[in-house]
Amino acid sequence: MFTNPIICALDTHDINHALLLTKMLYGRVSMVKLGLEFFTAYGLSGVQAIADCGVPIFLDLKLHDIPNTVSKAISVIASLNVAMLTIHVSGGREMMIRAMDSISGSVTKLVGVTVLTSMDDSDLKEIGVNESPVQQVMLLSKLAREVGLYGIVCSAFEAKEVRNRYTEKDLKLIVPGIRFDSDCNDQKRVKSPKDAMLAGANYLVIGRPITMSSDPVQTVEDILLSISKCI
């Protein structure tokens, strides 16, 4: 059975534009992603306004703080019943366990961010991480699996390695950094939708290629057609 893997990233602080896109993409994408830019501008009420359009929400806040702070923040966010919420796996085991406890009873699934797609080997070394992105993602995916997170966020470059170790029942793979050409913007580890799906992705986070398109609906349809044989 075909499952729509597209999550459209609404990386904007313009709520009217976000509402317009969400209504336009209703029934055509699996979720819309709201990030820190939107949440800082509009908070819980802004997220609720988008949710009222009927499209499931992927709230990408990448929470990373001491366990108690993250736990209390999630207790507040849980009332929104978003589909997925991100935390940083590098926040550690205790932080993730407390986060899982706080989300208990909610429909929200916790997803762990591993290595940002804006980072490469040299960036990791600058912050004291000597492993390659693949090695670091594998280390963090193991921790995420042990804690019981629903899935992880990783680039398509690491997805194949993770999928070779863990089945879809173990960890869902949410893959950002999806591009169609050489325009990578501020991301370094990027691949096409088809390549990401073949690597084992369950969800593709796609922003600018859709939101900056002259015809977002047609762009989504084109993406779905390009990956239909990979599902």
Curated annotation (Swiss-Prot):
One of its GO terms (cellular component) is cytosol. It holds the Pfam family OMPdecase. NCBIfam families: PRK00230.1 (NF001273), pyrF (TIGR01740). This is Orotidine 5'-phosphate decarboxylase. It comes from Ehrlichia chaffeensis (strain ATCC CRL-10679 / Arkansas). InterPro entries: Aldolase_TIM, OMPdecase, OMPdecase_AS, OMPdecase_bac, OMPdeCOase_dom, RibuloseP-bd_barrel. Pathway: Pyrimidine metabolism; UMP biosynthesis via de novo pathway; UMP from orotate: step 2/2. Disulfide bonds: none annotated. Belongs to the OMP decarboxylase family. Type 1 subfamily. It comes from the Bacteria. The active site is at K62. Its EC number is 4.1.1.23. Substrate binds at residues 11, 33, 60-69, 117, 179, 187, 207-208. Homodimer.
